Amino acid sequence: MKTFLLLLLVLLELGQAPGALHRVPLSRRESLRKKLRAQGQLTELWKSQNLNMDQCSTIQSANEPLINYLDMEYFGTISIGSPPQNFTVIFDTGSSNLWVPSVYCTSPACQTHPVFHPSLSSTYREVGNSFSIQYGTGSLTGIIGADQVSVEGLTVVGQQFGESVQEPGKTFVHAEFDGILGLGYPSLAAGGVTPVFDNMMAQNLVALPMFSVYMSSNPGGSGSELTFGGYDPSHFSGSLNWVPVTKQAYWQIALDGIQVGDSVMFCSEGCQAIVDTGTSLITGPPGKIKQLQEALGATYVDEGYSVQCANLNMMLDVTFIINGVPYTLNPTAYTLLDFVDGMQVCSTGFEGLEIQPPAGPLWILGDVFIRQFYAVFDRGNNRVGLAPAVP
């Protein structure tokens, strides 16, 4: 018995309590930016969202800048109701609500995605409260309902979620995802809704109050997964660097500095960042990002900042120093490869985003960062664990 208890304590310390790991496969698909660029509609999006890409910034502040989702490529499947109705979602640590399209939605985006039918679910309960989430220059609005939500064998009972009845603009029409499942802290939730992971903890569905994210770098994304209830040491090398959460809303942490090459260029006296699976790129204050683009030799062309694909081996590394530990992105890691009219195009994975006080200014470490560094989100100790991801 003592041996078993000792083993259990060791496994708990490793984030691997017996039966703790519930793995949600994440598929990697073509990003919305690539789709719109191929259809010649990307410039139209910039104009519709009041975006000035030459300045790399959103002109208008928003609760959820729509630009964050342009390069999202990692998606998972959930089901809502009895019998289950399936939806493809972004698992987003930068927000806290779950929403999917409603059968009552008349927006163009709802015509191209699965919609939730409350009348077809025997476990559905009407809550009736309205909700609204600001995206760029438009709002996603709807009503709140409650039903059981299942994620790879974990079934949350009585989960309140948003049923969108209006989705802004034409952007979501082309998106690969139907909705968003937020994994941020409750303070971010619109309408005072309890987030899905909080209900998982309250209903004792996870052995440990943590989840982790592995995003594969290979084009097909095979092996990418979200893990509830712990973390998988096979996805990273070395030890996790545990970083305290500085504010319990986003998964917000402190940066000690940002190096370009061997020189500290930003945050020499420290600054704040969030680790965000719902943001595809790495973002920062627009002025800082413009300086960074210039230091990397990136030039502005049409719809963003590009670099010469042949020059990657001569470009500078970018290093984020977090809790005293350097996290270095080489040019191959922070550069996005695309094909336009049959030609290879390389762009940087950095974008300017103005986040106004009191929430900002903030840097956002999105998927470009998380692909290189395995991320563990520990609600029990309010900390984020980071370690080099195993390819």
Swiss-Prot record:
GO BP field: antigen processing and presentation of exogenous peptide antigen via MHC class II; proteolysis
GO cellular component: endosome
Name of the top EC class for this enzyme: hydrolase
Residues forming the catalytic site: 92, 276
GO molecular function, one term: aspartic-type endopeptidase activity
Propeptide position ranges: 20-53
Role: May have a role in immune function. Probably involved in the processing of antigenic peptides during MHC class II-mediated antigen presentation. May play a role in activation-induced lymphocyte depletion in the thymus, and in neuronal degeneration and glial cell activation in the brain.
Protein name according to UniProt: Cathepsin E
Source organism of the structure: Cavia porcellus (Guinea pig)
Gene: CTSE
